[in-house]
Curated annotation (Swiss-Prot):
Annotated gene: SRY
InterPro entries: HMG_box_dom, HMG_box_dom_sf, SRY, SRY-related_HMG-box_TF-like
Location relative to the cell: Nucleus speckle; Cytoplasm; Nucleus
Major subcellular location class: nucleus
Keywords linked to the UniProt accession: Activator, Calmodulin-binding, Cytoplasm, Differentiation, DNA-binding, Nucleus, Sexual differentiation, Transcription, Transcription regulation
Protein name: Sex-determining region Y protein
Organism of derivation: Sus scrofa
GO molecular function annotations of the record: calmodulin binding; DNA-binding transcription activator activity, RNA polymerase II-specific; RNA polymerase II cis-regulatory region sequence-specific DNA binding
Length: 236
């Protein structure tokens, strides 16, 4: 199939008319008859099948019967919207909720009776109805590192022992990009240092540092630092 398509394409390019418009029309005509080019009809059919395979469509979904507050607020919402066109729907809902709470039981009773009547009609019309609330889409949670840091058991040190002064800066991570904002430096002085093997700044370090407190962090060390100073950025 690929060879036949290549030979057909070669014949198109060898045609007498070398104008770009003619060549483009020939290629498009060849692509329509070839199975190598997907058509829009297949994708549109897939879209219809996907939409049709949903749990419930908007027209088939049965609405819940109205409660007393909804029965009361229908006319009230319409009146408030006409009298105050500048008010938003959320503000109108808050105002209606406060006003509904201020009504007495005697004032609410007719609306409760109407709501019970509507529920009875709904049960007769849909005997097997079960309320199925729509699930809200789960919000994508920001991926955080498994831990803010890992146990710092090996660090790069020079051949001689130096007390380490770590400058810590917070890093705010957003997606795949991170912006570093420096906070107040925090000095952590190691009290006990034990060197097991020799190491240099370019090779793998085999030195183990034991301190009074455990330092947990990913340590992006920089080679151009002075022997006794290392900068650590903690993902925050």
């Amino acid at each position: 199939m690929v060879q036949s398509y290549a030979s057909a394409m070669f014949r198109v390019l060898k045609a007498d008319d070398y104008s770009p418009a003619a060549q483009q029309q020939n290629i498009l005509a060849l692509g329509k008859g070839s199975s190598l080019f997907p058509t829009d009809n297949h994708s549109s059919n897939d879209g219809r099948e996907t939409r049709g395979s949903g749990r419930e469509s908007g027209q088939d979904r049965v609405k819940r019967p109205m409660n007393a507050f909804i029965v009361w607020s229908r006319d009230q919402r319409r009146k408030v919207a006409l009298e105050n066109p500048q008010m938003q729907n959320s503000e109108i809902s808050k105002w209606l909720g406060c006003k509904w709470k201020m009504l007495t039981e005697a004032e609410k009773r007719p609306f409760f009776e109407e709501a019970q009547r509507l529920q009875a009609v709904h049960r007769d019309k849909y005997p097997g109805y079960k309320y199925r609330p729509r699930r809200k889409g789960e919000r994508a949670q920001n991926l955080l590192p498994a831990e803010a840091a890992v146990l710092c058991s090996q660090v790069r040190v020079e051949e001689r022992m130096y007390p380490f002064t770590y400058t810590v800066a917070k890093a705010k991570c957003s997606g795949t990009e991170s912006q570093l904002s420096h906070s107040q430096p925090m000095n952590i002085t190691s009290s006990l240092l034990q060197q097991e093997d020799r190491c240099n700044w370019t090779g793998l370090c085999h030195s183990r540092v034991t301190s009074t407190g455990q330092i947990r962090a990913d340590l992006p060390f920089h080679r151009g630092l002075q022997p006794g100073l290392s900068h650590i950025y903690f993902p925050y």
